[in-house]
C-alpha cells in the first residue's frame, strides 16, 4: 500500500498535496490540517 502512494508523491505536490489521499481528504474535510496529520501517520506506519 505504501509503495502505491510513493509514486503519487510526485503527482501529489502538483495538485497541492504530497499524497493523493490527502487531496481527497482536503476536499471532504474543511480543515486539511487534521487529515494531513492522519495521512502522514498512516503512510509513516508500516
From Swiss-Prot:
Biased composition (Polar residues): 25-40
Chain residue ranges for the region called Disordered: 1-46
Protein name: Putative uncharacterized protein DDB_G0285187
Amino acid at each position: 500500500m505504501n509503495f502505491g502512494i510513493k509514486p503519487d508523491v510526485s503527482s501529489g505536490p502538483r495538485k497541492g498535496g504530497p499524497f493523493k489521499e490527502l487531496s481527497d481528504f482536503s476536499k471532504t474535510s474543511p480543515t486539511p490540517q487534521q487529515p494531513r496529520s492522519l495521512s502522514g501517520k498512516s503512510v509513516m506506519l508500516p
